[in-house]
Every structure is written in structure tokens, then in C-alpha cells.
């Protein structure tokens, strides 16, 4: 889904509004190997405070699911950069799995990551996604055993998303040793590309993870924090942060 060495920015759809999200995506497009677009949810348990607050801001401002598809559709008028929706299962359930995935495909979505859908319960979802032409992305954590990592890789048609730490998302000072241990195991076991996320906030994080074999690195909280502070005026600050991460 993306070339090796890619930075994969994450933004929450509708924070602070749909047009601003589109503007941010277009501004970051030249730096991105792929883009993760989060679907706001009222109980984002896998996310840390920064991204939780972005979900709440979007919902408070009246976000509706159709706005995420509008953002992707408008983005597709300008770019072919792959977009992966990152969502909890509830919005999919409410819309209906096939309806959700069909609309996602029609808007130009390439892949989907359902944060709270365990791989062992994802067979039907994965089959429908394949029928609709949407690639699936699954999470693996530092405590994921090799056998489960193999199942995750087998169910994945996009890339395997390696969670660098235990707990929720959020920028950290250091990437823990357990993240590198997981990355080495994944490179040995997985046939799909792997991207590492959760906690990436510095240039040295990106460099060390790519050097260790990650195909891509996801950065979310460090960008979402800027949007929380700058709102609609965040564009140039986002670009500056991404350039810092890439060493430009």
C-alpha cells in the first residue's frame, strides 16, 4: 500500500471540521506514503488523551460519518495517495458492514483498520472487505505471540500495524525496547509490509524504526496535538512538524 521508508500521518476526520481536515490532508500529501484517517467515536478506548480529545471535538462540532467519505472523495480529486480508515467497530455496525465498506470504496478509501475487532472474529468482515475491494489492516502488540502474529499476517491484505507500546496512543519521549523486539519478530514472520505507530514524535524515532526494518512509520498524536492547539490555522505547523520528522 505504500513504498518502503514512508511516513504515514494520522488525522481525525472532522477535527475541527471537514474542510479543515481536507486542507490538512492536501498539505501533508507530498510527504505521505499513505494516510490514516480516523473516524470519530464517542468512546475511543484505544486512544490516548490527545486523540480522544480530537474525537470529542469533531463530534461536538456535529461530525457525521458521511463527512469522512466526503473528505476522501474530495481528496481523491487531487491525489492517489492510499488512505486507510482507522475506526472502531460501532460506526461500521450501525451503518451495516457491507454498506460501510461499499461507500468507503466508492469514495476512494484503500484500506481499513478496525481497532477493536480481534482477528479471530474478523473472518466475515475480511471476506466482505475483499469483495468490496478494501484492504484490511490489523494490529499486533508487543505481547502478541508468534502464532497469533502469523494469523494476523494471514488475515491482512494491506499492512500489519505494529503497536510500539502497551496501552493507548500518544506521543512518547522514547520508543521502548519491546517495540524493536516486536518489529524484529514481525519482519521474520510477516509476508506483508509492517508499519509502526503509537508514540512516534521525534525524528530519531522515525530513523531508528526505519533502520530496524519498518516499512513505514505512523505519526498521529504529535500532529493531532497541533490541530488541538492551532485549529483551522494548523496547516503550516503540521507541515513543519512532518518536515522535522523526515529531516527535511
Swiss-Prot record:
Pathways involved: Amino-acid biosynthesis; L-tryptophan biosynthesis; L-tryptophan from chorismate: step 5/5
Top-level EC class: lyase
PROSITE patterns: TRP_SYNTHASE_ALPHA
Keyword tags: Amino-acid biosynthesis, Aromatic amino acid biosynthesis, Lyase, Tryptophan biosynthesis
Active-site residue numbers: 36 (proton acceptor), 47 (proton acceptor)
GO cellular component: cytosol
Role according to the record: The alpha subunit is responsible for the aldol cleavage of indoleglycerol phosphate to indole and glyceraldehyde 3-phosphate.
Record NCBIfam families: trpA
Protein name stated in the entry: Tryptophan synthase alpha chain
